[in-house]
């Protein structure tokens, strides 16, 4: 009859059609019956660094940056601190993403402008972007209201899908009393090109390194191509992992309903463990498929 205070939520999308195939709104409460909060689409939380590929890096990859572009990881007055307190100087954009360098995300977002950067999540239906979000802190996921796991899964699935957005839904088909199909979301989906194809493929290439040598190192799936991003808020009240394979995209959030610091909460602790266990399970028996290469990939 225990009531769990530490909560979580997750959303999984089938990348072949953009449909939501699994959703978890929280930990089961035996003592509670009837309607309960579904945190996967009803709770808006700060996404931390998981927001960087959506609003900063993929947009900049459309504008001439590449994984090999050199950027300057040097602290500057008025700028953010890197999570580990260290600064690496001249580094590649790939390395900056793998190590989740806040300084680089902040600089590139200012260069891009918040108006341009935030136009991307808005195109993908992020419902709670407000006027007060149009500041550099948004580059690090510092948003007024936050995001849901459904929104984040849809955005990362868009990157996997060569930049083409499909509105997330759990409804695959609706038929009437006579069996006539009224809605068929498997075959007739409205699509929107949000990111340029090559930029999305470059982003996927970079995010593969996160699981090999970055903030989620050592957690790549066995015998399956995968890419992803960790996210942790500065006060450790929200932890995320957003990742995908050519088959599925899954996002996981962990935290308290009433935000509270959790000393050992990082994107690469509880959220990543949940993501890896779930993704390993649903990929059993599936053949490894490589991600598509970007133009100029070595």
What are these regions, as identified by a protein language model?
Residues 1-2, 7-14, 22-24, 30-43, ...:
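A penicillin-recognizing enzyme superfamily signal
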Residues 18, 45-71, 96, 155-159, ...:
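Active-site SXXK
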Residues 18, 56-65, 76, 98-102, ...:
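Sec-exported extracytoplasmic/periplasmic mature domains
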Residues 33, 37, 51, 60-77, ...:
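Short, well-structured active-site flanking segments
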Residues 80-82, 113-154:
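Mid-domain, small-residue-enriched loop/turn segments at the edges of structured enzyme/sensor domains
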